[in-house]
Amino acid sequence: MAISDLLNRRVRALPEEDEEVYSGESASEAESNDEQIDESRSDDSSDESLEDHGGARSNGSELSDDDEADEDSNISEDSAADDDDESDASEADDMQASLSHISFGALAKAQASLGPHAKRKLKHSKASTAADAADDDDEKAAAAPSPLDDIRARIREAREQKRQGSAPSASKARDAEKPSRSSKHAPMVQSSKHAVSRKRTIIEPPAVLKSRDPRFDPAVRGQGGSRDGGINKAYAFLDEYRANELKELKEKFAKTKDLREKEDLKRAIRATTDRLRTTENRRREKEVLAEHKKREKQLILEGKKSNPYFLKKSELKKQVLVKKYESMGSRQRVKALERRQKKMTAKERKEMPMERRGFENDAAPFNNDGGGRKRRKLA
């Protein structure tokens, strides 16, 4: 019954972290099972030794009693054979009773444990002990591994396989858990392969005319890329519009009698006049620069100069002023010079200290602080 209980015992696998405890328990159980098996084997060996002693005694009695008849020897042999048969029958009954209590799972494990390795061992033992049949049977019985040993070996192999398989499985799980990117802030990897659209343009639609801005049109700007010159030429008509507008504003200012409207018209006339004057001054500066560059290039080509001379801002301003006065008439030039003289005089007077400013009335009131004279406001 001990063998059936051991075979019916089921093995329960524990988690990996409890393997050491489980292995210790299984080792203790295996030691207890080995002790039980050793005890059973010792009992069998004692029985066999007793039988051997009995046979020896019977043989001694036969050798000592030479006068006994052949019938007594036959009877003793028959009795010994009957004893052997009875012992074999009792052992077979015990084995049958124990096997009847073994579960199908234990039988399947025992059958699986008897693999080709065990069969090769049995064949080798049969071939080596073919001389003596009885001794051969005893040696086979002694050399054949017990089902419990095979089950223990099978369990050990399963544990080792489980330990070896758990490491790659854990690594695979870790690899599967790893994200596709190194970090969540890293850019995502996207395949460049995209499905081609099945739509095909058989007939091209007519081209739609797009609006063009003449300021950025290459036809207006010219091939040389001189943007300012092209724009000035393209929008030269605006200067004529501004001149006509100034003329209309002056006529309206002469006809109107409303003071508020006159103030508005006066402000508009001043703004338009300043805009036209600024445009004219810029145009005059460009002309002066163009003439100077042309003159310098000509001198370099003639060999009179090796390096060009670039005008300073003060010299450019003087040449622009000379050109302005040359383009005026005699009366306009006189009036312009008078206005400029007054302007320069006022500017110099402002820069002078109060004590040096010329006043007609020397008895003008001074400040209470004891400083210079007070500045008179012009009406």
Swiss-Prot record:
InterPro entries, per the entry: RRP36
Bias type Acidic residues, positions: 63-94
Compartment list: Nucleus, Nucleolus
Primary location: nucleus
Ranges in coiled-coil conformation: 242-300
Example GO biological process: maturation of SSU-rRNA from tricistronic rRNA transcript (SSU-rRNA, 5.8S rRNA, LSU-rRNA)
Domain of life per record: Eukaryota
A Pfam family this chain is assigned to: RRP36
KW Coiled coil (keyword) present: yes
Keyword Ribonucleoprotein belongs to the record: yes
Compositional bias (Basic residues): 117-126
GO CC terms in record: 90S preribosome; nucleolus
Ranges of compositional bias, category Basic and acidic residues: 149-163, 335-360
Annotated region (Disordered), positions in chain: 1-98, 113-231, 329-379
Entry keyword set: Coiled coil, Nucleus, Ribonucleoprotein, Ribosome biogenesis, rRNA processing
Purpose: Component of the 90S pre-ribosome involved in the maturation of rRNAs. Required for early cleavages of the pre-RNAs in the 40S ribosomal subunit maturation pathway.
Subunit record text: Associates with 90S and pre-40S pre-ribosomal particles.
Family listed: Belongs to the RRP36 family.
Protein name: rRNA biogenesis protein rrp36
Organism: Aspergillus clavatus (strain ATCC 1007 / CBS 513.65 / DSM 816 / NCTC 3887 / NRRL 1 / QM 1276 / 107)
